[in-house]
UniProtKB/Swiss-Prot annotation:
Cysteines paired by S-S bonds: none
GO CC, one annotated term: nucleus
Name of the protein this chain belongs to: Coiled-coil alpha-helical rod protein 1
Localization, UniProt: Cytoplasm; Nucleus
Record's function text: May be a regulator of keratinocyte proliferation or differentiation.
Region feature (Disordered): 573-592, 641-672, 700-721, 744-770
UniProt keyword annotations, A-Z: Coiled coil, Cytoplasm, Developmental protein, Differentiation, Nucleus
Bias-annotated ranges (Low complexity): 701-721
Record's keyword annotation contains Coiled coil: yes
Database matches in InterPro entries: HCR
Organism of this sequence: Mus musculus (Mouse)
Biased composition (Basic and acidic residues): 648-672
Biological process (GO), any one: cell differentiation
Presence of the UniProt keyword Nuclease in the record: no
């Protein structure tokens, strides 16, 4: 029987009830950044020492329990308390490790987010560096474009100067040729007026010279057309280049200049030149036809005159020796009349030809002067447009210099921003590298701790299994002790004061059994749960370890990439700095060149403007002088035309007077001849009457046959003489009538020709006369 004093230090059953384990909050700890993530090795050593001490106490408790039976309840309770405290500590350790694993997961997520942000920043920096490189390339391209534009402007200026010099030389040569041709034409006209007898030959020579001049003019026109075509092609190319340049630079100038179409003007000029060539060819063909007709008429007239002279010389013979002056007078009168008529006809034809030549020359001169005026006005307009283009180019260059200055300022500001961004990026990269190194060190430390915890899990499981076995042995010993106590109680004699004690003991024993069963069930359940939690924690730890290894590898790769990108960014930064220095140097040199070019170009432009103004003034004065000369020549031509018309009217009046005089002379000569014949017949009759009266009648009788014979002989002689005189007179009259008819026909033809020429010349001659 157990002594009652042995149960005096028993613990109530409520003390052995299951206590809930302390649960830590799942929220993120506030001491994550201040307290170290994992417990220090000193705390781990303390925990291990506590576990060893508990293990030693458990073993000593078992030994004492085996050796001593009185302190069984106390030792069992202390053992259970120690075991429950060890389990609670292990559960706390496991929960702390789980919390640390969760905190590590959160840190890994935050590191991933920071790495993604750093990647984005690096990508933005790379994009900005690419944009800077593109901007630098664009600046270099613009600088090269400005250089090429300056070179092109210089080439255009040189080409324009050469073309203007060539045009001036060509215009001077053309003016000299025109002046020489005009002087030659005037000299020829004066020579033709001075020498009327050689008018036809000189007109033919003048026509030949005109033909040669027209051929020369045609050749010159063809050359000019070729030159104009070449110039057209060159100017079209230059204009296309200028149009492209103007269109590309309109946004700087702000002016919307309508594109010019000089090709249409050149086409119109070419068409006008072709029309003038056609008209000249037609005029030349007409002149050739008129010359041929005139030659035919002259030949026919000379032939007719030769025939008439032969007939007159053959028919008119001196029959009357008493009157030898009559045929001479007739011949002289006829010759003078022929010469005068021929001279008048030649003069009229020469005047008509001169009038035609002068009018055609005046028309040609007026057309040439008009063409010169139009060409000079076109040149003036072209030069004004060129000046406007040059001023626009100067303004564009000024705007481009301003834009380049602004771009340089922007590039410098961008460079400063890039330097600041690069410095901030370097600092961020340094911070990221430090954070990565710290996270890598923390990950390595956590991995080592996880490995240590995983390595300690088998030893802890062995300890748990050993503790379970010890509990079973203790339970068996306890049951044996209880059974021995019951046997002792049963074998001991009952006493009077013992029943209440037995009832208390039995109640306490029942409670102890229940408590034992409950604790046994709890121990088994807790051991099973601990094993499950340990397995789950082991699996989670393995998975987390693998994931952390992968994350660490990824972070290492990202770190390497970041370092490589940092190196490339540094290289690009160095290249960008070098390119920026080169661009700044090139910009400075370009500024100097641009200022020099602007000064040179401004001086050259001012000189060119002054030269163009002086040349235009000279050309305007020359054109005014030529216009005045042309007007004076036109007035002279009008005066000469009026004089020629007056002379023609006077010549017509003279011709009419001569015809009237010739008719009167012819009538008087016929009357005189008839009177002479009548007087001769009367004298003859008187002589015959006197002879008949003087001679005696005998003699008359004797001599009657003789007289009859003589009269018969004289009568045929007189008759023959009369017949010859009458025949000569009739022939002369017939010749005179034929000549007068021929002259009248020629005059009618000349009058018709004059009327036709006047009709054809009156419409264009009105502006000249006005």
């Amino acid at each position: 029987m157990l002594p009652p004093s042995g149960f005096a230090g028993l613990v109530p059953p409520s003390h052995f009830q299951a206590r809930p384990l302390p649960t830590l909050p799942r929220m993120a700890p506030t001491w994550a950044s201040d307290v170290p993530l994992v417990q220090s090795p000193a705390s781990q050593d303390v925990l291990e020492r506590r576990l060893d001490a508990q293990r030693s106490t458990v073993t000593t408790w078992g030994q004492d329990f085996c050796g001593d039976g009185q302190g069984l309840g106390r030792r069992g309770r202390s053992l259970e308390l120690g075991f429950s405290s060890a389990l609670s500590q292990q559960a706390e350790l496991i929960s702390r490790q789980l919390q640390e694993l969760r905190r590590l997961e959160e840190e890994v997520r935050s590191l991933r987010e920071t790495s993604l942000q750093q990647k984005m920043r690096l990508e933005t920096q790379a994009v900005e560096l690419d944009a800077l490189a593109v901007a630098e390339k664009a600046g270099q391209a613009e600088a090269e474009g400005l250089r090429t534009a300056l070179a092109g402007a210089e080439m255009v200026r040189k080409n324009l100067e050469e073309a203007k010099h060539k045009e001036l030389e060509e215009i001077q040569s053309l003016h000299q040729e025109q002046l020489s041709s005009l002087t030659q034409a005037h000299q020829k006209a004066l020579d033709s007026l001075a020498s009327k007898a050689e008018g036809l030959e000189k007109s033919l020579n003048s026509l030949e010279t005109k033909r040669a001049g027209e051929a020369k003019q045609l050749a010159m026109a063809q050359k000019e057309a070729d030159m104009l075509r070449n110039q057209l092609s060159k100017t079209q190319e230059e204009l296309e280049a200028q149009v492209t340049l103007v269109e590309s630079l309109r946004k700087y100038v702000g002016e919307q200049v309508l594109p010019e179409f000089p090709s249409q003007e050149w086409e119109l000029e070419r068409k006008e030149l072709l029309d003038t060539l056609k008209h000249l060819k037609e005029d030349r063909a007409d002149l050739q036809a008129t010359v041929e007709l005139l030659q035919v008429r002259v030949q026919s007239l000379t032939h007719m005159l030769a025939l008439q002279e032969e007939e007159l010389t053959r028919k008119i013979q001196p029959l009357d020796p008493l009157e030898p002056e009559f045929p001479k007078k007739c011949r002289s009168l006829l010759r003078n009349w022929r010469e005068k008529v021929f001279a008048l006809m030649v003069q009229l034809k020469a005047q008509d030809l001169q009038h035609r030549d002068s009018t055609s020359q005046l028309r040609i001169q007026v057309a040439e002067l008009q063409e010169q005026v139009t060409s000079q006005s076109q040149e003036q307009a072209i030069l004004q447009r060129a000046l406007q283009d040059k001023t626009a180019q100067v303004e564009v260059e000024r705007m481009s210099t301003k834009s380049l200055q602004m771009e340089l300022d922007q590039a410098q500001e961008a460079r400063r921003r890039q330097e600041q961004q690069i410095a901030s990026a370097e600092e961020q990269l340094k911070f990221v590298v430090g954070a990565m190194n710290s996270t890598q060190a923390k990950l390595q430390s956590t991995m080592t701790r996880m490995d240590q915890a995983v390595a300690r899990i088998p030893s802890l499981s062995n300890r748990l299994s050993y503790a379970v076995r010890k509990v079973h042995t203790i339970k068996g010993l306890m049951a044996r002790k209880v059974a021995l106590a019951q046997l002792r109680v049963e074998s001991s004699p009952p006493s009077e004061a013992a029943p209440p004690l037995d009832t208390d003991l039995s109640v306490e024993l029942e409670q102890l059994r229940e408590e034992r069963n409950r604790l046994d069930a709890e121990l088994q359940l807790s051991a099973h749960l601990i094993q499950q939690e340990v397995g789950r924690a082991r699996e989670q730890g393995e998975v987390e370890r693998r994931r952390l290894i992968e994350v660490a590898q990824q972070l290492e790769q990202e770190l390497q990439r970041a370092q490589e990108s940092l190196a490339s960014v540094g290289q690009q930064l160095e290249a960008a700095r070098r390119g920026q220095q080169e661009s700044t140097e090139e910009a400075a040199s370009l500024r100097q060149e641009l200022t020099q070019q602007q000064e040179i170009y401004g001086q050259a432009l001012q000189e060119k403007v002054a030269e163009v103004e002086t040349r235009l003034r000279e050309q305007l004065s020359d054109t005014k002088r030529r216009l005045n000369e042309a007007r004076r020549e036109q007035a002279k031509a009008v005066v000469s035309l009026r004089q020629i018309q007056h002379k023609a009217t006077q010549e017509k009046e003279r011709n009419q007077e001569l015809r009237r005089l010739q008719d009167e002379a012819r009538k008087e000569e016929g009357q005189r001849l008839t009177r002479r014949v009548q007087e001769l017949e009367r004298d003859k009759n008187l002589m015959l009457q006197r002879l008949l009266a003087v001679l005696p009648s005998g003699v008359n009788k004797k001599c009657s046959p003789r007289s009859v014979e003589s009269s018969s002989s004289e009568s045929p002689a007189a008759a023959s003489c009369k017949e010859s005189v009458k025949g000569s007179l009739t022939v002369l009259l017939d010749n005179l009538q034929g000549l007068s008819e021929a002259i009248s026909r020629d005059e009618d033809i000349c009058v018709e020709d004059n009327q036709n020429t006047k009709k054809t010349k009156n419409p264009p001659s009105d502006p000249l006369l006005s």
